[in-house]
A protein has these predicted regions:
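A short catalytic or substrate-binding loop motif that flags glycine-/basic-rich loops and adjacent residues
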Residues: 17, 55-57, 68-69
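N-terminal ordered "arm"
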Residues: 37-47
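Short, Lys/Arg-enriched N-terminal segments with co-localized hydrophobic residues
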Residues: 3-17
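Intrinsically disordered, low-complexity regulatory regions enriched in serine/threonine/proline
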Residues: 117-130
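An amphipathic, aromatic/His-enriched active-site/gating alpha helix that lines ligand/cofactor pockets
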Residues: 48-60, 80-119
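Short, extreme N-terminal segment that most often corresponds to the first beta-strand
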Residues: 19-30, 35
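Short, well-ordered beta-strand segments in beta-rich or mixed alpha/beta enzyme
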Residues: 21-26, 61-92
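Short, conserved charged micro-motifs
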Residues: 31-37, 84-88
């Protein structure tokens, strides 16, 4: 798995302090339409399964598409009490939805979500508070 950037920060949401894990994943050339179809399924036919999956992991996921001159990126944030633990727990799951999700990620990004990301998570360097 190629992780271009990750960060863990603390954010306040409804006066509850939560951790946030942010990750960026490149979309290989020619795969953006397939990725958009995957996102449409998560927002449509598989919305309930997706919500239940993230709820059972104790996280809220937000996913963004970023177009750059170098290619498209997926930006993913996980918010919760322990998003890094949720990411590790997700990699171990074998229920039908999770297997399908991992297969989609593998086909689009060429990443194996069963294996942990290479290397340690980076250190947070700067946090801006209002």
């Amino acid at each position: 798995m190629t992780v271009l950037w990750t960060d863990e920060v603390t954010v306040t949401h409804k006066e509850h302090v939560m951790a946030m894990l942010a990750m960026a994943f490149p979309i290989p050339a020619g795969k953006t339409d397939q990725w958009k179809k995957f996102m449409s399924e998560l927002a449509g036919a598989r919305k309930a399964e997706f919500a239940a999956s993230r709820r059972s992991l104790g996280v809220r996921e937000r996913t963004f598409l970023q177009h750059t001159p170098q290619g498209d990126l997926v930006l993913v944030t996980l918010e919760g009490d322990h998003p890094e633990t949720a990411f590790a727990e997700f990699s171990k799951r074998t229920d039908p939805f999770t297997v399908w999700f991992k297969q989609q990620v593998s086909e689009i990004h060429g990443m194996d979500l069963i294996a942990p990301p290479p290397g340690p998570m980076p250190q947070q360097l700067i946090v801006s508070h209002s």
